């Protein structure tokens, strides 16, 4: 499709998608002049230039700081909606999962272990998923506080008084 376009049409479309990812003047720079986050946004622009039906993102936030990661997550979510495309994200970043994921599948050793949405994941009883999500004590406490808020009890044999008095 794109190969049949005349140069001015191609340039116009490239500039449109660069503008959409907030990189209006990136086409005037060398790749070495772009930050990691800018390179990720260029990658997203390249992926959407032909109006695809699917967007595949493999670890879209690898190597990025937390603020830039959040920006990339929001951009992926916005583009998914604006372009009415199905986006598939492969990631180990639970922040991205929670930010982007409408429908989440957790896999372990190539097998589906859990399926649901980003609201249900907090209440999952799948031990392997919980080990992955709530690896730190802080996150375990956050989950227990969430469970306490919604159900009046915590999810395991942890001491509720200790949790509340931390």
Regions found by a protein language model. Give the residues of each.
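Conserved ABC ATPase "signature" region
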Residues: 7-25
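Conserved ABC ATPase signature
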Residues: 30-34, 38
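A short, proline-enriched helix->beta-strand linker immediately N-terminal to the Walker B motif
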Residues: 49-53
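Catalytic Walker B motif of ABC-type/P-loop ATPase nucleotide-binding domains
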Residues: 55-58
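Helix N-cap at the start of a conserved alpha-helix in ABC-type nucleotide-binding domains
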Residues: 66-68
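C-terminal boundary and immediately downstream tail of ABC-type ATPase nucleotide-binding domains
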Residues: 122-157
């Amino acid at each position: 499709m794109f190969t049949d376009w005349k140069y001015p049409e191609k340039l116009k479309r490239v500039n449109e998608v660069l503008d959409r990812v907030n990189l209006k003047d990136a086409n005037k720079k060398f790749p070495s002049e772009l930050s990691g986050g800018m390179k990720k946004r260029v990658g997203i622009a390249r992926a959407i230039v032909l109006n695809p039906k699917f967007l595949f993102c493999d670890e879209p936030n690898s190597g990025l700081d937390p603020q830039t990661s959040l920006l990339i997550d929001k951009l992926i979510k916005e583009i998914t909606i604006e372009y009415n495309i199905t986006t598939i994200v492969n990631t180990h970043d639970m922040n991205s999962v929670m930010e982007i994921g409408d429908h989440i599948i957790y896999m372990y050793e190539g097998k589906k272990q859990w399926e649901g949405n980003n609201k249900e994941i907090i209440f999952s009883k799948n031990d392997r998923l919980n080990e992955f999500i709530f690896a730190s004590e802080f996150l375990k406490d956050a989950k227990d506080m969430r469970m306490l808020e919604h159900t009046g009890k915590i999810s395991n044999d942890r001491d509720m008084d200790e949790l509340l008095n931390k």
